[in-house]
From Swiss-Prot:
Positions bearing N-acetylmethionine: M1
Sites marked Cleavage: P10, A11
Domain Protein kinase residue range list: 72-369
Annotated protein name in UniProt: Dual specificity mitogen-activated protein kinase kinase 2
Illness the protein is tied to: Cardiofaciocutaneous syndrome 4: A form of cardiofaciocutaneous syndrome, a multiple congenital anomaly disorder characterized by a distinctive facial appearance, heart defects and intellectual disability. Heart defects include pulmonic stenosis, atrial septal defects and hypertrophic cardiomyopathy. Some affected individuals present with ectodermal abnormalities such as sparse, friable hair, hyperkeratotic skin lesions and a generalized ichthyosis-like condition. Typical facial features are similar to Noonan syndrome.
Keywords attached to this entry: Acetylation, ATP-binding, Cardiomyopathy, Cytoplasm, Disease variant, Ectodermal dysplasia, Intellectual disability, Kinase, Magnesium, Membrane, Metal-binding, Nucleotide-binding, Phosphoprotein, Serine/threonine-protein kinase, Transferase, Tyrosine-protein kinase
Keyword Hydrolase: no
One GO BP annotation of this record: epithelial cell proliferation involved in lung morphogenesis
Binding partners and assembly: Interacts with MORG1. Interacts with SGK1. Interacts with KSR1. Interacts with KSR1 and BRAF; the interaction with KSR1 mediates KSR1-BRAF dimerization. Interacts with GLS.
Pfam families: Pkinase
CDD domains: PKc_MEK2 (cd06649)
Species in which this protein is naturally found: Homo sapiens
Amino acid sequence: MLARRKPVLPALTINPTIAEGPSPTSEGASEANLVDLQKKLEELELDEQQKKRLEAFLTQKAKVGELKDDDFERISELGAGNGGVVTKVQHRPSGLIMARKLIHLEIKPAIRNQIIRELQVLHECNSPYIVGFYGAFYSDGEISICMEHMDGGSLDQVLKEAKRIPEEILGKVSIAVLRGLAYLREKHQIMHRDVKPSNILVNSRGEIKLCDFGVSGQLIDSMANSFVGTRSYMAPERLQGTHYSVQSDIWSMGLSLVELAVGRYPIPPPDAKELEAIFGRPVVDGEEGEPHSISPRPRPPGRPVSGHGMDSRPAMAIFELLDYIVNEPPPKLPNGVFTPDFQEFVNKCLIKNPAERADLKMLTNHTFIKRSEVEEVDFAGWLCKTLRLNQPGTPTRTAV
């Protein structure tokens, strides 16, 4: 008699590179998987709505079977970045709408196979704060990663429409990012490695999810050799090449929050004139209420347009930007515009020494997060109004 295998989530039993087919023991196996799924979901401390949505996603995913290039119909392009192009597609056999990321890599078959193997870990990442994964495969020189489609897009796209994102909305974003990072760390021992607005996705149901985290070391290495990715959200210790941990993700989250709150990438910091244009009134800074610095500063590299129109300042070179992150004071939220709780939360994320920087547990218990957890905020309504999306009948509960 064969040793009984440890049961796993249904997502793990669906190998995207193997065609779906009937199994003589599939009924018994599916019952065992259902029991195990329920146990796994209970461990995640989800509310009923989150549990139902996760179960619905996994049920849909179970119908997908093998993923093949010919089975996808392209609908539109969603964006480009991180060395790949993301398109909205329909998977014809299942009828599901997905987001398909295509990454072109000139690599040997052994490396390619290792990347596909490493990406299978994504089948185990089932959380309300992590974008769902359908599978990965290789075809014609490109690796395809097929994910849940989030109809609100990424927060950098939302920022273009919103100009600035309100503090109460960013409270819900902060909760989701912290819970997503904690899930990856505690359940899978994974660091994200690339937290930034374009890797935080939202949808019209009010869900906020992380994507593009560093699950495949081989893919990270291969892309580093093929693409010069942005380093502008990296923590100082990463830029200096020293050891980094989840604390580096905390820095990236803090920097992202300042960008989303102010309306542009915050290094170098906006001067008094720009802050007045952003907030519609003079903004004070410093302990004694002095007007914010009026010294002219260059704009961030490669960013001629902010949420507030064309930026006529000379561009900062990329090496100047990286030097600024390492050697200059960290960015902060201007005084008199945001609550002290939010300002302090961001400041704790942006401490340059990672040993002194707040960790996930400290931030989860911070007053800003505790307040945001109980605050009634219609995130779905705000997003749909901002992006002119149709709001579904059952948005996510406002208290995330």
